[in-house]
Amino acid sequence: MAHGHHHVPVNTEGQQGVRKGATFIIGGLTSGHGVFHWFTRSFEVMMPEVRDAFGLTGVGVGGLATTRELASGIVSLPGGIITDMLRRYWGWVLATCMALFGLGWLVIGISPVYPLILVGMALVAVAASVWHLPAMSALSHHFSHRRGAALSFHGVGGQVGDAIAPIVTGFLLAAMAWNQLISIYAVAPLFLTFLVFWAFRDLGKSERVQTETTSFSAQLTASAALFKNGRLLLITLVAGLRGMAFVAYIPFLALYLNDALSLSAQSRGAHLTILVVVGIISTPIMGYLSDKFGRKIVLIPGMIFIGVMTVLLVPFSGNSIFLILILALLGTFLFSDQPILTAAALDLVGEGVAATTLGVLSFSRFLLSATSPIIAGILYNINIDYTFYYIAGLFGVAALILLAIPLPKVVTAGHHDDHGHGGHGHDDHGNDDHGHGSHNH
């Protein structure tokens, strides 16, 4: 990323000193993203202990995930509109999210009853969901000429959190009770709150924005205009279909490795780690390529490739070499498509509605993907193979729709930040998926 430092000051009027550098902005926001993923993934690792402590059924465990998805999905749309309005206070928004995150874990850690855990879960989900909005908007704004790469790096922060969490949390669980560990974990975000505020207190400020205060009605009008943008709505649909496939993929892949291939817990973990590790390497590369050659040139072959690999998984997974090879190949695209889709959406919108656009993307992904694990589960009960055909089909349909969407020509990194494509002033800002709930969050 360092190669473009000389472009960056165009859009970083507000940042002071060390906090002005491209490396600092990307590094800081990416690290924060990793913290959110680390904790969310750690809680999933602790799920058997939580289940036993509260005597939960499968429905009770599902209720925790549903609460997380509901809270993060519902808050994303109003959160996006408010984030765009509060642009000068993005540092405050990020710091508040980090504090709320710690508070949510504290509630979960000291909770004597199940309903209180749901409250903590909702707090955590809202904090993680809203963090993505200013963070990705800022990255998209500061790195508008290499938006795909910047958003991909942010995504990698989450993936690193996902990869490390099970190992560290599993190790610590051997030494202490789950609720003690969560209470200790909760202290970290509370301390980090101050660091986040110091680092990003000037993030959304710039000379232009200082003079404009957008009224709520004007912001709503600008937001409503997004729903009249046909290309944006189609990209949102593609992102939703991709979300449907993704949220069904990882849990049922884990079940498949257990049920059909009889792998041990350690072996399952190792196989799923292959996916993530390959993703960490390939995601920034794919983001960079999408900046250089265009979003569709990377996304469409990638989605078709995932579909084909998913279909091949069923007949070839009995051979351990083939299984590892297919998982590694899946990892090349499985995580990298989301930040590129986000970048493609942000390429189409103007200054001032980036966080709202991100909110729309998250909200639609939430609406579409909410039922997907249930559909996948019903198919899994009929025939394990059908679940994978369903996932492959979703990727195929998404690729076909994407093929039909005319996207603007990507401006290469040599161009000035403020010359947008599609005639929109390419100074827009953006947000990650978030897969917050799925994590992809």
At which residue positions do the language-model features occur?
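Flexible cytoplasmic inter-helical loops of multi-pass small-molecule transporters
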Residues: H3, F200-T221, V411-H424
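Cytoplasmic helix-loop-helix junction between adjacent transmembrane helices
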Residues: G120-G158
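Extracytoplasmic gate region of multi-pass secondary transporters
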Residues: F43-M47, G230-I280
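Helix-loop-helix hairpin linking two adjacent transmembrane segments in secondary transporters
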Residues: H154-G204
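A late C-terminal transmembrane helix in Major Facilitator Superfamily
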Residues: D162, E351-I382
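Conserved MFS/SLC helix-loop-helix module at the cytosolic interface between two early adjacent transmembrane helices
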Residues: I74-P112, S290-K296
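C-terminal transmembrane helical hairpin of 12-TM major facilitator-type secondary transporters
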Residues: R295-L341
